């Protein structure tokens, strides 16, 4: 693989490279995390200046960890306006994002839009709980404004689509202010199995605000890092397998991977329609519930109950999902004790049949659908782009190797390009296998046999040191069963190991978001697990 090696001047010498290199898991496990706790070299990304950023009028420190309800109270009382809130978040981005590379660009119309929403409020019109609330969205979600939509790729640089994705239109209708676009693993981490999560040619390497040499996971890396750092009230990520829940775990957030189809998927630069979905990323369950409600037109906030764990039957999926990280295991065991103390009935173990048996068929499906779905997206949503197909993107990357492929290649793109149409029997067989083993012979079986309301497991391990030379160091994850089945999962903070976040996932049946959020909220209210990041250079080895 090309790219930098030790001694390259692009490396920042403030630590030792890991002494042991672990085998990297398949890209299908990018809902995973973690490697040994130790110092590493941090690669400094060479990135262009943040587009459109305005410093605003100050007050950014007041916004750290502020919730949607608190912002609404401030606007209702007159202590704040939507415009002053947006200005303060913009100032916070301007002051701190040089450490994270989490935000690709900010919306040049944000302050004007916020001002118009203030005028509505003054006239007695409040659209709902998102009125005047700043939201960051991942850069594979189409916005029909002056911001680009690129999936982090220079192949789509300058692409300003003519209209919003349906989910963005819903946010605007609910009164949200689209504050900016976040960095991501380029092309949502489907280009190479040697990639570094959070790296894109457009944005460089995104860092984790809990320890700047650690990875934020991906592919919704920038949304995770930005919301953890209080660059906006809430954010939107997308997931094919792990891309919401893993960065939520790595950045101590609540991440909701909804049931497939709950949120309209048009206008998202795709990997695969059989698994792709957008979802909320927030610092609290209540905020995630408000955002999911706006995206889906359901009132999930009404389900939140601090006593919601009483009598709930919660299974523990141990096989395949415990044992790869002692730190994650210990923190999740403590979280399970909280569930018990709050009145949940714990069914342990409640293993998921066939977990791990459909990784190969999942990859086949994703590669087939990528080729077809990307061409359809480019035709409908990026008609002025110079690239019209996956083949065009591959050719662009080859012609711009120094900027697009300095660290890793595009072997998954090439494999996808070699696939045939979606009428191929190989694709149909792989899709049928995925759905059978993940749904009817998988999650459906354990939920029915054990009469469960949810299943819990570690989301992943503590964040690993970012390594552009060798790529990500994954040990394990619990994202795949729900991702392949199209069922919901909610990641919540479980605790910290050496100051590094670890999450726990609640996995549910189809369309059980209200139940999962109720359980997650009751856990959160009892455990109070989240701490704000401190932007440390590396892990705090003095803490437990």
Regions found by a protein language model. Give the residues of each.
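An N-terminal boundary/leader segment
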Residues: 11-116, 122, 318, 334-337, ...
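Short, surface-exposed loop/helix-turn segments at secondary-structure junctions
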Residues: 428, 450, 462-480
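Gly/Ser-rich catalytic/binding loops embedded in alpha/beta enzyme cores
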Residues: 53, 57-241, 259, 311, ...
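Short helix-loop capping/hinge segments that flank enzyme active sites or metal/cofactor-binding pockets
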Residues: 132-151, 308-317, 368-439, 493-501
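Acyltransferase
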Residues: 86, 115, 165, 326-351, ...
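Flexible glycine/proline-enriched surface loops and loop-helix/loop-strand junctions
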Residues: 151-153, 206-212, 219, 269-277, ...
């Amino acid at each position: 693989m090309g790219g930098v090696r030790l001694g390259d001047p692009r490396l920042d010498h403030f630590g030792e490279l890991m002494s042991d290199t672990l085998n990297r898991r398949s890209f299908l496990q990018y809902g995973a995390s973690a490697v040994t706790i130790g110092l590493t070299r941090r690669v400094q990304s060479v990135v262009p200046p943040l587009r459109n950023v305005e410093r605003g009028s100050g007050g950014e420190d007041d916004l750290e960890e502020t919730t949607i309800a608190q912002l609404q109270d401030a606007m209702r009382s007159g202590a704040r306006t939507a415009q002053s809130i947006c200005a303060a978040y913009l100032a916070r981005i301007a002051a701190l994002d040089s450490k994270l590379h989490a935000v690709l660009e900010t919306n040049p119309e944000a302050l004007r839009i916020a001002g118009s929403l203030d005028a509505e409020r003054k006239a007695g019109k409040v659209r709902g709980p998102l009125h005047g609330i700043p939201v960051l969205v991942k850069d594979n979600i189409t916005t029909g404004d002056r911001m680009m939509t690129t999936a982090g790729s220079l192949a789509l640089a300058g692409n300003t689509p003519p209209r919003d994705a349906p989910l963005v239109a819903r946010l605007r209708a609910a009164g949200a202010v689209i504050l900016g676009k976040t960095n991501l693993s380029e092309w949502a981490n489907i280009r190479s199995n040697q990639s570094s999560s959070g790296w894109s040619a457009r944005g460089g390497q995104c860092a984790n605000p809990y320890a700047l040499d650690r990875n934020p996971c991906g592919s919704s890396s920038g949304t995770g890092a930005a919301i953890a750092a209080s660059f906006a009230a809430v954010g939107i990520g997308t997931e094919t397998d792990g891309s919401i829940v893993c960065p939520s775990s790595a950045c101590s957030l609540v991440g909701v991977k909804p049931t497939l189809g709950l949120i309209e998927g048009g206008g998202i630069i795709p990997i695969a329609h059989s698994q792709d979905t957008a979802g909320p990323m927030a610092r609290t369950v209540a905020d995630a519930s408000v955002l999911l409600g706006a995206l889906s037109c359901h009132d999930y906030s009404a389900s939140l109950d601090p006593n919601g764990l009483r009598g709930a039957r919660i299974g523990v999926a141990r096989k395949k999902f415990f044992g790869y990280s002692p730190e994650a295991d210990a923190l999740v065991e403590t979280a399970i004790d909280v569930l018990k103390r709050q009145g949940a009935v714990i069914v342990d173990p409640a293993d998921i049949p066939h977990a791990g048996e459909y990784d190969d068929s999942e990859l086949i499906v994703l590669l087939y659908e990528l080729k077809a779905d990307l061409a359809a997206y480019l035709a409908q949503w990026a008609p002025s782009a110079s690239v019209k197909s996956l083949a065009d993107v591959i050719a662009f990357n080859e012609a711009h190797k120094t900027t697009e492929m300095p660290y890793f290649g595009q072997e998954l793109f090439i494999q996808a390009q070699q696939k045939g149409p979606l009428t191929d029997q190989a694709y149909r067989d792989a899709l049928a296998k995925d759905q059978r083993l993940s749904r009817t012979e998988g999650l459906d079986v354990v939920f029915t046999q054990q009469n469960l309301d949810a299943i819990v497991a570690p989301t992943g391990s503590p964040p690993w040191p970012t390594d552009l030379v060798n790529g990500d160091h994954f040990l394990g994850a619990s994202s795949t069963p729900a991702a392949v089945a199209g069922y919901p999962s909610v990641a919540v903070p479980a605790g910290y190991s050496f100051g590094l976040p670890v999450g726990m996932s609640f996995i549910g049946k189809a369309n059980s978001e209200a139940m999962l959020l109720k359980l997650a909220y009751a856990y959160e209210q009892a455990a109070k697990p989240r701490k704000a990041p401190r932007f440390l250079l590396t892990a705090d080895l003095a803490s437990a």
